[in-house]
From Swiss-Prot:
The gene is Cyp313a4. InterPro entries: Cyt_P450, Cyt_P450_E_grp-I, Cyt_P450_sf, Cytochrome_P450_Monoox. May be involved in the metabolism of insect hormones and in the breakdown of synthetic insecticides. It comes from the Eukaryota. It is a peripheral membrane protein. GO terms for molecular function: heme binding; iron ion binding; monooxygenase activity; oxidoreductase activity, acting on paired donors, with incorporation or reduction of molecular oxygen. Its main location: endoplasmic reticulum. Heme binds at residue 440. Pfam families: p450. This is Probable cytochrome P450 313a4. Belongs to the cytochrome P450 family. It is found in: Endoplasmic reticulum membrane; Microsome membrane.
Length: 494
């Protein structure tokens, strides 16, 4: 009896200590509103289905305001859609690290720029920044133009043949660009690339990583085996690693022999050249080179494909804006067919800029991004967010806030980005590539690539769809996804 009493007393003291150690989190509930949820679960039961997450976030923000605090099980959790608070988070050195939800990326893609913790992230970012400089990006224009010309050839049989799902074609196209600008033009000679199996492998890993992010128990290999997800995932990871390692080893062998590299002259600015040079100097390991190369490809191909497709989809739903874009592009390129787009040409596409910005406002490439506080974070309003809080920055709802963007915030209208409409907006009200200390390293790459692609597609084709804008239903994912993807019809322009 005495032993039982002692054990109960010990458990009670441990429970009191546990509560006391988290007192600052509990005090935060008095300063920041939010759903209380249930004991142990917190608000997790509202977020069990991935299809419901964005809607649940929207309901919480409507009810409690643009910054809320609650719990995901035992984890203190904030949702933020207030531009000023977002700025506080993105510009703070105490909020550089990504949230724990991205643990799956380390396993699937590798430990690199996407998920590295500070200070290692800062070191890698500084070393890799030169690979995304302005002159380097301009050197990729021949690849952008060449690959878009091939895409036009692939689209030709689809014209006037009803509505089609173009996403697989666009993903194959953007994967081709991403691998070539990262590792060289000769990657297209690899068997896995020619057979299109490489795209399937990347898609398999992305799908499994997403499952792991939103179902944390799947981060365990044993649980993935029980769920029947491990074998294909492991095979996909292995084949992609072999593909990347083969390219790296060939590059290193060429450098060692002093032979002329097999890559073309316009490949001199490759990301792979930079990281292999860092390895020779002892700054990077072989695994660093593999991981960073892999992550750059992962980060580039799906988001760019989605951005292009969603823009075409929105223009098909709002044909008046598509016609205005077409007229602008036609003044620069009077003839249909293939043509080379220069950087100077992209600078003339003012209305296409408005369209692309508005497309990424209505459908941001990533709907929600996550950070965590590594030290106490003092917000502009004086509230201190303690160390250890997970923060979800809800880009999707901030981009659609009527308080920020006006009464038609939830519809597509490129006029939102006319100078007189955008000049008074908070600088962090529009963040398709995030912003601040840890912004997307490849945002300029994505914009130039998308503009070249859209210019050629819109000059050659009119895009139509029977799917109404009002029926779009967005699903929370690592990148923005649709529950039902609208099909597009192509009509040849003259």
């Amino acid at each position: 009896m005495l032993t039982w009493t002692l054990w109960c007393g010990l458990l009670f003291l441990l429970w009191i200590y546990f509560l006391w150690s988290r007192r600052r989190f509990y005090l935060l509930t008095l300063k920041i509103p939010g759903p209380l949820g249930y004991p142990i679960l917190g608000m997790a039961h509202w977020l069990m289905r991935r299809e419901d997450i964005l809607n649940a976030f929207g309901c919480f923000l409507d009810k409690h305001g643009p910054t809320i605090f609650s719990w995901l099980g035992p984890i203190p959790f904030m949702i933020v859609s207030d531009p000023q608070v977002v700025q506080d988070i993105f510009t703070s050195p105490h909020c550089v690290n990504k949230g724990i939800i991205y643990k799956a990326v380390d396993d699937g893609a590798g430990v690199g720029l996407f998920s590295l913790k500070d200070p290692r992230w800062s070191i890698h970012r500084k070393l890799l920044n030169p690979a995304f400089g302005h002159k380097v990006l301009l050197s990729f224009l021949p690849i952008f133009n060449r690959e878009t010309a091939l895409l036009l050839d692939q689209l030709e049989p689809l014209q006037d043949d009803g509505e089609k799902d173009l996403i697989p074609l666009l993903q194959s196209f953007t994967l081709g660009i991403a691998t070539q600008t990262t590792m060289g033009s000769d990657v297209k000679d690899e068997e896995s690339f020619r057979s299109n199996s490489l795209l399937g492998r990347y898609q398999c890993i992305l799908e499994t990583m997403t499952d792991m992010c939103f179902s944390p128990w799947l981060n365990s290999r044993f649980c993935r085996q029980l769920a029947g997800k491990e074998s294909h995932y492991y095979q996909a990871k292995t084949e992609i690693r072999q593909f990347i390692r083969k390219i790296i080893e060939r590059k290193l062998a060429e450098d060692e022999m002093g032979a002329l590299p097999s890559i073309q002259s316009n490949d001199k600015n490759l990301f792979l050249n930079l990281v292999t040079d860092l390895m020779r100097r002892g700054v990077f390991t072989l695994k660093n080179v593999e991981d960073e190369s892999n992550i750059i490809v992962f980060g580039a191909f799906e988001t760019t494909a989605n951005a292009v497709y969603y823009t075409l989809m929105l223009l098909a739903m709002f044909p008046e804006y598509q016609e205005r874009a077409f007229e602008e592009i036609k003044t620069i390129f009077p003839n249909t067919g293939d043509f080379d787009v220069s950087y100077a040409d992209t600078q003339q596409m003012v209305y296409l800029d408005l369209i692309l910005n508005e497309s990424m406002r209505v459908i941001p490439p990533v709907p929600v991004v996550s950070r965590q506080t590594s030290q106490d974070l003092k917000l502009s309003n004086g509230i201190v967010v303690p160390k250890g809080v997970q923060i979800a920055i809800d880009i999707y709802h901030m981009h659609r806030s009527k308080k920020i963007w006006g009464p038609d915030a939830e519809t597509f209208n490129p006029d939102h980005f006319l100078p007189h409409n955008i000049q008074d907006k908070h600088p962090y009200a529009y963040i398709p590539f995030t912003k601040g200390i840890r912004n997307c390293i490849g945002w300029r790459y994505a914009l130039i690539s998308a503009k070249v692609t859209l210019a050629k597609l819109l000059r050659n084709y009119r895009f139509k769809t029977s799917f109404p804008f009002e029926n779009l239903y967005f699903v929370e994912d690592i990148t923005m996804k649709l529950k039902s993807v609208p099909l597009l019809e192509l009509q040849k322009r003259t």
